[in-house]
Amino acid sequence: MKNVTDSFLSLGHWPFAGSFGFFNTDILSTNLINLSVVLGVLIFFGKGVCASCLLSDLLDNRKQRILNTIRNSEELRGGAIEQLEKARTRLRKVEMEADQFRVNGYSEIEREKLNLINSIYKTLEQLENYKNETIQFEQQRTINQVRQRVFQQALQGALGTLNSCLNNELHLRTISANIGILGSIKEKTD
């Protein structure tokens, strides 16, 4: 026992370079006491756990974590593939709807274009009719104005001729002749 006590007392005299205080970390100068202390600590804290069992458990745990990670990755991959397929399906559907809208839009544009052309033709036809009616109205008005002027000029010319040709005597004779004609018409009707 004295040797053991001396060994512990002599630990204080060991150099600290490369040591932890109680243990000599230099593998070549490690003595039997250090090895026994290390083995005692391992046995005390290990309590029936063998190194191969501990290593096996560590490897099994690591294997389970890796398998779980792979399983989770596969599930995520499957979900991502499913979402991708749904997105592709929606994309195809939207593209088909866009094509239908495009075709319907072109058809609608063509219909609107034809409606606009027809409307313009109708408007032009109405304008042509209004123009023709206006021309006819103006022609008729001009003809009426010309007739009135011709009539007025003819009347003035006739009155001028009558006034220049008629004197009092001729005027009285014309009146007497007209009275005679009216009198004979009256006798025939009675």
From Swiss-Prot:
The chain crosses the membrane at residues 35-55. It holds the Pfam family ATP-synt_B. The keyword Transport applies. Keywords: ATP synthesis, CF(0), Chloroplast, Hydrogen ion transport, Ion transport, Membrane, Plastid, Thylakoid, Transmembrane, Transmembrane helix, Transport. GO terms for molecular function: proton-transporting ATP synthase activity, rotational mechanism. It is a single-pass membrane protein. GO terms for cellular component: chloroplast thylakoid membrane; proton-transporting ATP synthase complex. It is found in: Plastid, Chloroplast thylakoid membrane. Signal peptide: none annotated. InterPro entries: ATP_synth_b/b'su_bac/chlpt. F(1)F(0) ATP synthase produces ATP from ADP in the presence of a proton or sodium gradient. F-type ATPases consist of two structural domains, F(1) containing the extramembraneous catalytic core and F(0) containing the membrane proton channel, linked together by a central stalk and a peripheral stalk. During catalysis, ATP synthesis in the catalytic domain of F(1) is coupled via a rotary mechanism of the central stalk subunits to proton translocation. Belongs to the ATPase B chain family. In plastids the F-type ATPase is also known as CF(1)CF(0). PANTHER family: ATP SYNTHASE SUBUNIT B, CHLOROPLASTIC. F-type ATPases have 2 components, F(1) - the catalytic core - and F(0) - the membrane proton channel. F(1) has five subunits: alpha(3), beta(3), gamma(1), delta(1), epsilon(1). F(0) has four main subunits: a(1), b(1), b'(1) and c(10-14). The alpha and beta chains form an alternating ring which encloses part of the gamma chain. F(1) is attached to F(0) by a central stalk formed by the gamma and epsilon chains, while a peripheral stalk is formed by the delta, b and b' chains. This is ATP synthase subunit b, chloroplastic. The lineage of its organism: Eukaryota, Viridiplantae, Streptophyta, Embryophyta, Tracheophyta.
